[in-house]
Amino acid sequence: LPDTFDSRKQWPNCPTISEIRDQGSVSVEVSAEDLLSCCGFECGMGCN
């Protein structure tokens, strides 16, 4: 594993990756795999 990791540098074509959204009232469990599976080519296509 790397000592540091910056997703903004890894995926610069995904402008919303730096946003942190408060979804505390949603009450839905979402795994990291769920989030990554929605990412299309270089994170620009989103979920369908």
From Swiss-Prot:
Subcellular localization: Lysosome
Protein name: Cathepsin B
Keyword Ribonucleoprotein among record annotations: no
Leading EC class: hydrolase
Superkingdom of the source species: Eukaryota
GO molecular function: cysteine-type endopeptidase activity
Its job: Thiol protease which is believed to participate in intracellular degradation and turnover of proteins. Has also been implicated in tumor invasion and metastasis.
Disulfide bond among keywords: yes
GO cellular component: lysosome
InterPro entries, sorted: Papain-like_cys_pep_sf
Family under the similarity heading: Belongs to the peptidase C1 family.
Predominant cellular place of this UniProt entry's protein: other
Keyword terms of this UniProt record: Disulfide bond, Hydrolase, Lysosome, Protease, Thiol protease
Enzymatic reactions: Hydrolysis of proteins with broad specificity for peptide bonds. Preferentially cleaves -Arg-Arg-|-Xaa bonds in small molecule substrates (thus differing from cathepsin L). In addition to being an endopeptidase, shows peptidyl-dipeptidase activity, liberating C-terminal dipeptides
GO biological process: proteolysis
EC number(s) reported in the record: 3.4.22.1
